[in-house]
Amino acid sequence: MRPLMRNRASERGVDPAPSRWAWRMQRLLLTPAFLLFLRAGVPVLVLFGAATWWLSDTDRRAAIWETVAEARASFETRPEFMVQLMAVDGATDALAAEIRKEVPLDFPLSSFDLNLSDMRDRIVALDPVKSATVRIRPGGVLHIDVEPRIPVVIWRNPQGLTAVDVNGIHVGPIAQRMDRPDLPLIAGTGATEHVKEALNLYRAAGPLGTRLRGIVRVGERRWDIVLDRDQRIMLPKEGPVEALDRVIALDTAQDILSRDVNRVDLRLGARPTVKMSDYATNVWWEIRQVSRQ
């Protein structure tokens, strides 16, 4: 028997299989990644949207931040995190006082409120400090270990007297020369850039004893040795130590520096020059005039 009603779709020639888009959707629903997104991703997006809506209220956000701040403060102010005092080692009393002035702290305070790196940079920036380490020791002690600069010379400049280390870095001002009679005196523009050479000259001038008054940098090129009685030994730019040794040897043999001499000029090594004092020059001219008569 034939059915009374025929399938109209078959009469029209329509394919009973699903459409391309329907087939793709069915395949997508069977994909593990899409199933995971439906199971986990959609709930997460819903929760994120709800949280965003809830936090959009200013009062709620302020209450949360206040709670977090209180919890943090309660943790940071626990006794084991509190710093009670500062200890400075390796520095003189004056330098320790200067360090405490540079990094003023109101104890007790939490160790979380201390920026140790910034404190160290500020301490090392002080002229008398060569290096420093800053750390918090058990027991709530802020320990600062300082390596001070060692002054080796005193530099006389238009602003006064300044102690200088071997690298020419300023250590600190000096009120008067007699505060550090153990240090040699240098002067002149650019003298601090040649401290090591000045120290070599100072050691070579040892036989001059207490007659030595200082070493002056002239024209930022060479040195003058300044003695008492306004005498000067004018050294050349090259080989100043050797030139000074020759003058000292000449003085040992002939006592040249004990005579009425103002300048011993060694700037021209092949032609050293001696300048007599005005009194000695006048006497010499008188002797010549008498000898001509």
Curated annotation (Swiss-Prot):
Coiled-coil residue windows: none
Domain POTRA: 81-149
GO biological process: cell septum assembly; FtsZ-dependent cytokinesis
UniProt KW keywords: Cell cycle, Cell division, Cell inner membrane, Cell membrane, Membrane, Transmembrane, Transmembrane helix
Membrane topology, Cytoplasmic segments: 1-27
InterPro entries with a match to the protein in the record: Cell_div_FtsQ/DivIB_C, FtsQ, FtsQ_C_sf, POTRA
Main localization of the protein described in the UniProt heading: membrane
Topology feature Periplasmic, residues: 49-293
Residues annotated as transmembrane: 28-48
Subcellular compartments: Cell inner membrane
GO CC aspect terms: cell division site; plasma membrane
Membrane topology: Single-pass type II membrane protein
PANTHER family: CELL DIVISION PROTEIN FTSQ
Biological role stated in the UniProt entry: Essential cell division protein.
Family to which the UniProt record says this protein belongs: Belongs to the FtsQ/DivIB family. FtsQ subfamily.
Protein name, as recorded: Cell division protein FtsQ
Species the sequence originates in: Roseobacter litoralis (strain ATCC 49566 / DSM 6996 / JCM 21268 / NBRC 15278 / OCh 149)
